[in-house]
Amino acid sequence: MAGFERFFGKPRKENENTGTHWLTISDLMAGLMMVFLFIAIALMISAFRERDRIKEIAITYQNNQVAIYEALMSEFREDLPRWDAFVDQNTLSFEFRSPDVLFAGGAVEIRPRFQKILNEFFPRYLETLRKYKSSIDEIRVEGHTSSDWIGALDDTDAYFCNMELSQGRTRSVLRYSYDLPDVVDDREWVKKYFAAVGFSSSRIVLCDDGREDRDRSRRVTFRVITNAETQIRKILLDNEEDS
């Protein structure tokens, strides 16, 4: 037996601690896997909750869009033809499209006919939107012009001349509307949420053949912007702060 051991070597005894050593590492790895699994599940739950909240806001936004559009149409449907006005459901823009009624060429002063329209339109417009205040972020009075400008040196010069004109016109419209006696009780809300924006010729209207429709390009719109995008940004920001 001694010779056998000298030739082949002494058989090793199993180290009792070896099994314990590998068992400890296995337990550690299993524990780490469970930790990572719980982290992944927590992240998935958070992502699903964020998705559901954004989806809920998107649905609410769509419902608000439809509700505001239907409210405007219910209030003004019979007036649209005689004002040559139009309500866009996608942008919630109330558009006045008769340039000869709105302003004289190159002028920022509101014509008498448009003043009469605003006298009738603006107080009712505010009253219609009153119930949707909580979902409105801003209401823009937008001024648009054609690309024409008599005496312009080039297209750039015409663009900036029309920019000044469109901004002046929207300020005139907003100031006139703000000063109406029937709006006294809503003036703080008007100051907080209304803005006058001039777009110059950056959003011209095109004919079917692709040419500029100069008359339709000269227009004034009242556009409602809801706060859905703001709410979504707030959700994303809150999640970043929590993470």
Which residues does each PLM region occupy?
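Short edge beta-strands and adjacent turn/loop segments
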Residues: 82-95, 137
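Periplasmic OmpA-like peptidoglycan-binding domain that tethers envelope proteins to the cell wall
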Residues: 112, 144-233
